[in-house]
């Protein structure tokens, strides 16, 4: 069970709450025929899942966002997220580490670099270095929209084995690191449901982001008026992770303030601990 807890820290810190693991079944995946098929209580924005281009006036935060993960009142992990302009692209850097007792029981040290187009928000490349228990890997995912393929190259750092696969993607996708920032660019209108394609390089799935309501949230970074969003997908990997909710600041920047996952073994909360220059 410790392994499940520790890996979940990494998944929720870097928005992998919204994607099936490579090789898992993903009913309703884009490019495989079908749609998410979840009952909706509000209007779905757009007739199908798509990445909406950057809306006029929106600006990404240029500070470093520092997060902490808490489980049963114990700090279980820390993470940082930063986005910087790099020519015509946005460059996202992410770090996730287990800490304290959890780190002694299960080592997590993950590093992420994601690149997406600054205007149409389509993911371009994702580079990952992951150390999770005995699984250490270097992974590069290149999104080639000319041939509509995600090219995944991965090396096992323990045994030296490498693999390369090409998997179908639609015309534009977001990835498991950029996804949380993509949602922040949306208007997040009351009761709306936003459908968009998200790829981990192996599978592309439809994510439905339900705008559930507003709430005041207090974290070490301050007190925030927030918009609560519930991401859903019609596939077992997300369902098995329980109820997931993300709170964004109710202002023009839509900063991710808190992520919470209610699992059968308890509740994991990831909260904004500091905003640093």
Outline where the language-model segments fall:
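Bacterial N-terminal signal peptides
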Residues: 10-21
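Generic detector of low-complexity/intrinsically disordered segments
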Residues: 13-15, 29, 154, 183
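Acidic, serine/threonine-rich low-complexity disordered tracts
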Residues: 28-145, 182-277
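Intrinsic structural disorder/low-complexity segments
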Residues: 8-10, 35, 43, 170
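Ser/Thr/Pro/Gly-rich low-complexity, intrinsically disordered segments
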Residues: 22-27
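Bacterial N-terminal signal peptides that target proteins for export
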Residues: 2-12
């Amino acid at each position: 069970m410790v392994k499940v807890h520790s890996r979940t820290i990494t998944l929720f810190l870097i928005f992998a709450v919204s994607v099936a693991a490579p090789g898992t079944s993903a009913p309703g995946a884009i490019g495989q025929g079908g749609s998410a098929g979840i009952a909706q209580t509000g209007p779905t924005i757009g007739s199908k899942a798509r990445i909406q281009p950057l809306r006029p006036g929106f600006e990404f935060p240029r500070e470093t966002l520092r997060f902490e993960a808490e489980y049963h009142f114990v700090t279980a992990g820390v993470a940082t997220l930063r986005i910087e302009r790099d020519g015509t692209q946005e460059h996202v850097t992410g770090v996730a580490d287990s800490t304290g007792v959890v780190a002694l029981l299960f080592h997590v040290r993950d590093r992420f670099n994601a690149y997406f187009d600054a205007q149409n928000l389509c993911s371009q490349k994702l580079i990952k270095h992951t150390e999770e228990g005995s699984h250490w890997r270097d992974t590069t995912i290149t999104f080639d929209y000319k041939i509509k393929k995600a090219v995944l190259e991965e090396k096992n750092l323990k045994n030296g084995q490498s693999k390369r696969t090409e998997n179908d993607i639609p015309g534009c996708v977001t990835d498991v690191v950029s996804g949380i920032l993509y949602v922040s660019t949306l208007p997040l209108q009351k009761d709306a449901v936003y459908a968009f394609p998200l790829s981990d390089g192996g599978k592309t799935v439809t994510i439905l982001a339900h705008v559930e309501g507003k709430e005041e949230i207090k974290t070490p970074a301050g007190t925030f008026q927030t918009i609560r969003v519930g991401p859903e997908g019609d596939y077992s990997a997300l369902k098995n992770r329980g109820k997931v909710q993300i709170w964004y600041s109710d202002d023009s920047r839509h900063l991710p303030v808190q992520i919470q996952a209610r699992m059968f073994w308890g509740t994991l909360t990831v909260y904004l601990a500091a905003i640093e220059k």
